[in-house]
């Protein structure tokens, strides 16, 4: 039976699985799935033919790992932890860090089962299990990357940014930030929203699946996806009767890679 089939079958019977009852085949299959995620050999979501495809069986493996493992004491350098998932860098020495090609500034924390590509800089931040952070990305101070979130190449997650995680409900897609995006300080992108390549999100913008995304150039309102090259700020849309207004995200312009390369981020956000 394939690794995927073992995971799928075990997940269907998860109510009967515990640390004391799990079989060796399932335990090893879950461990192998987490090794694949940890090394970047597999990822929860990948782009194919221009669209994002979610590998649900890998999400199932992450969820099963919580059922089959007890909490245990873990060393974490300056402190100790009591959890089901080991710290990714817990056993790293100088050679392992050089081979990984990442910078990890204390007290940044990454759980095993997350992939951190070469060239990534982790300021004091948090990356959860199943996440994928691609090369050249900066995860700035107090930013959090949730479970199974997918972060592209050369992305800047500014201070305090929250990228939402998603394990359940199982059918929910992960939050995705594509290549060359800038996410401004204290912004939150959650609930499987996709921010497409080259977009700039201003400081303090909150986008979930129910958030209206208003394109002021076309007057269109959309949900769940920020188109490529968008420059987005927070705003409000008035109610039909004029009695109140409700929060929305506003696309104020769209720029191509050439323009973005010539103009600074702050200049793009000025109107």
From Swiss-Prot:
**Molecular-function GO terms, alphabetical:** 2,3,4,5-tetrahydropyridine-2,6-dicarboxylate N-succinyltransferase activity; nucleotidyltransferase activity
UniProt entry tagged with the keyword Repeat: yes
Its recorded reaction(s) are: (S)-2,3,4,5-tetrahydrodipicolinate + succinyl-CoA + H2O = (S)-2-succinylamino-6-oxoheptanedioate + CoA
Question: Where does this one sit in the cell?
Answer: Cytoplasm
Biochemical pathway = Amino-acid biosynthesis; L-lysine biosynthesis via DAP pathway; LL-2,6-diaminopimelate from (S)-tetrahydrodipicolinate (succinylase route): step 1/3
Q: Name one GO cellular component term.
A: cytoplasm
Q: Which UniProt keywords apply?
A: Acyltransferase, Amino-acid biosynthesis, Cytoplasm, Diaminopimelate biosynthesis, Lysine biosynthesis, Repeat, Transferase
Provide the residue positions that the database annotates as binding substrate.
Answer: 103, 140
Provide the E.C. number(s) assigned to this enzyme: 2.3.1.117
Presence of the UniProt keyword Cytoplasm in the record: yes
Q: Where is the signal peptide?
A: none
Give GO terms for biological process: diaminopimelate biosynthetic process; lysine biosynthetic process via diaminopimelate
Identify the PANTHER family for this entry.
2,3,4,5-TETRAHYDROPYRIDINE-2,6-DICARBOXYLATE N-SUCCINYLTRANSFERASE, MOLYBDENUM COFACTOR GUANYLYLTRANSFERASE
Subunit:
Homotrimer.
Give the protein family: Belongs to the transferase hexapeptide repeat family.
UniProt protein name: 2,3,4,5-tetrahydropyridine-2,6-dicarboxylate N-succinyltransferase
Q: Which organism is it from?
A: Methylococcus capsulatus (strain ATCC 33009 / NCIMB 11132 / Bath)
């Amino acid at each position: 039976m394939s690794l995927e089939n073992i995971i799928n079958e075990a997940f269907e019977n998860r109510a009967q699985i515990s640390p004391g009852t799990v079989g060796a085949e399932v335990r090893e299959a879950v461990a192998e799935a987490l090794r694949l995620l940890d090394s970047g050999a597999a990822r929860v979501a990948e782009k194919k033919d221009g669209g994002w495809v979610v590998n649900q069986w890998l999400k199932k493996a992450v969820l099963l790992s919580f059922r089959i493992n007890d909490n245990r004491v873990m060393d974490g350098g300056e402190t100790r932890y009591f959890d089901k998932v080991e710290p990714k860098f817990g056993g790293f020495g100088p050679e392992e860090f050089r081979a990984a090609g990442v910078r990890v500034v204390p007290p940044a924390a990454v759980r095993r089962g997350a992939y951190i590509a070469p060239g990534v800089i982790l300021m004091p931040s948090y990356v959860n299990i199943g996440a994928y952070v691609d090369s050249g990305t900066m995860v700035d101070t107090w930013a959090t990357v949730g479970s199974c979130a997918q972060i592209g190449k050369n992305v800047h997650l500014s201070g305090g940014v929250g990228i939402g995680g998603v394990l359940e409900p199982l059918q929910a897609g992960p939050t995705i930030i594509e290549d060359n995006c800038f996410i401004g300080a204290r912004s939150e992108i959650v609930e499987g929203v996709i921010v497409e390549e080259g977009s700039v999100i201003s400081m303090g913008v909150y986008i979930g699946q129910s958030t209206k995304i208003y394109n002021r150039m076309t007057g269109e309102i959309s949900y769940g996806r920020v188109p490529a090259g968008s420059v987005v700020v927070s705003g409000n849309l008035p109610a039909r009767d004029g009695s109140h207004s409700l929060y929305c995200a506003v696309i104020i312009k769209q720029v191509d890679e050439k323009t973005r390369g010539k103009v600074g981020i702050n200049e793009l956000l000025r109107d």
